[in-house]
Amino acid sequence: MNRARILSRVLWRQGFSKKIDYARPCVTSLCTNSVNIRRQATVAVNDGYVKKFMKAVGWMDQERTRLKLTGYFLYECVPDSVSYDEWFEDLELPDTFASWFTITELHVWLLLVRYMAEDVTSSASEKKKYVKGDGHFVRNCIVEALWADVANRIKFLEGANPAIARKQVTELSEQFQAALVAYDEGLNEDKILAAAVWRRFYSLSEDVKAEHVAKIVHFIRHQLFMLDKIPSEKLRWKPEINWLSILKH
């Protein structure tokens, strides 16, 4: 009786002493189909995956960082290079912050038009279509730099009140969006463009000289022509913008 018990215990231990490793493929007789052992990791971490992850979280994306710097550089070339005094004097504009913003706004729009054109694709079988790309990204960076500069300048205005300053920025933002739409509509026709200039620069005043509006329209056409001549590669990494003088139009 004791021998039988000892024998049964030995057999029981031998049958269950081998533990099953559930992390490995099944090799027992219970597996009816063959199992192919994967030689690769469950999640393949390659350069493409890492790059996508970095883009998602906004880390270490060198190309986007360079493009953002391009956008900020492009904006800075407006207030640093445009001769505002010539615009004030030649076009009989008041030397005020509002006039400064209107002139800056126009030059920023010219940059936006050029960079948005970089995202327009066309082929022999398809019509032109717009696809958001680097041009759209740089455009947003230019606008971002504009508002950062505006907010900073308003703080230094004499007697500036923070609450009033925020309200002014909001109003300027609304005017900016309306101006962009109006200028865009005038791209293909001088009459519409002249109306947009008259409204934005002179508030539709009947006392304005027609030659002033015509001069601004001519400047816009000439400047767009010059911007269109800049190659795409230079536009991305080493943009050199030469702003034309309003006095030569």
What residues fall within each predicted segment?
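Generic detector of well-ordered secondary structure
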Residues: 1, 11, 18-21, 80, ...
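C-terminal structured interaction module
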Residues: 2, 247-249
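Intrinsic-disorder-associated interaction segments
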Residues: 20, 42-46, 64-67, 169, ...
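N-terminal mitochondrial targeting presequence
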Residues: 1-54
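N-terminal non-cleavable signal-anchor helices
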Residues: 11, 28, 36, 107, ...
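A charged, amphipathic interaction segment
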Residues: 161-247
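Conserved, aromatic- and glycine-enriched, well-ordered alpha/beta core segments
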Residues: 57-73, 77-103, 110-174
